[in-house]
Amino acid sequence: MAAVRGLTAVALRVVTPWQRSRLLAASRGPRALREVSFSSPEAGEGQIHLTDSCVQRLLEITEGSEFLRLEVEGGGCSGFQYKFSLDTVINPDDRVFEKGGARVVVDSDSLAFVKGAHVDFSQELIRSSFQVLNNPQAQQGCSCGSSFSVKL
């Protein structure tokens, strides 16, 4: 499928499940303090920031060439939703964000909706999951934190 830019294209894009993807939920261990530190971006381009708890959890669950893929797809109660999966294939339109040996990969269409945001791993009684925090491209989000509406 050719990469198509624009809000409508991303909203209507069909996202196929990644082969070998795993559910990224339950975890054990104490809740880590979330000290936000930044990955080094290329000048003039969008970036994703990885928190220390995100890096720590990725180092625990990834093997070999695996990385965390972040996608934005249409859906959820606010119009768009975040999708996390483990993957091993980097596509030509992907951007790789690395910190401390942990990698998060975002395709160029999704990056337009999350640039400047922080990827965190949160461990709570009701769930443990990767989350997007402080997304400057989001106008508002739902209470569960997995869907959002964009600023127009």
From Swiss-Prot:
Binding positions for Fe cation per the UniProt entry: C77, C142, C144
Where is the protein situated, by its record's location annotation? Mitochondrion
Q: Name one GO biological process term.
A: iron-sulfur cluster assembly
Protein's UniProt keywords contain Manganese: no
The UniProt entry, under InterPro entries, shows: FeS_biogenesis (IPR000361), FeS_cluster_insertion (IPR016092), FeS_cluster_insertion_CS (IPR017870), HesB-like_dom_sf (IPR035903)
Q: Which PROSITE patterns match?
A: HESB
What GO CC terms are in its UniProt record?
mitochondrion
Q: Which terms are listed as keywords in the entry?
A: Iron, Iron-sulfur, Metal-binding, Mitochondrion, Transit peptide
Q: Which Pfam families match?
A: Fe-S_biosyn
Transit peptide residues according to the UniProt entry? 1-6
A molecular-function term among this protein's GO annotations:
iron ion binding
- Look up the domain of life of the source: Eukaryota
**Family annotation (Gene3D superfamilies):** HesB-like domain
Q: What does this protein do?
A: Involved in the maturation of mitochondrial 4Fe-4S proteins functioning late in the iron-sulfur cluster assembly pathway. May be involved in the binding of an intermediate of Fe/S cluster assembly.
- Describe the family membership recorded for this protein in Swiss-Prot or TrEMBL: Belongs to the HesB/IscA family.
Q: Which NCBIfam families match?
A: iron-sulfur cluster assembly accessory protein
Tell me how this protein assembles.
Heterotetramer; forms a dimer of dimers with IBA57. Interacts with [2Fe-2S]-ISCA2 forming the heterodimer [2Fe- 2S]-ISCA2-IBA57 complex; [2Fe-2S] cluster binding is absolutely required to promote the complex formation.
Protein name stated in the entry = Iron-sulfur cluster assembly 2 homolog, mitochondrial
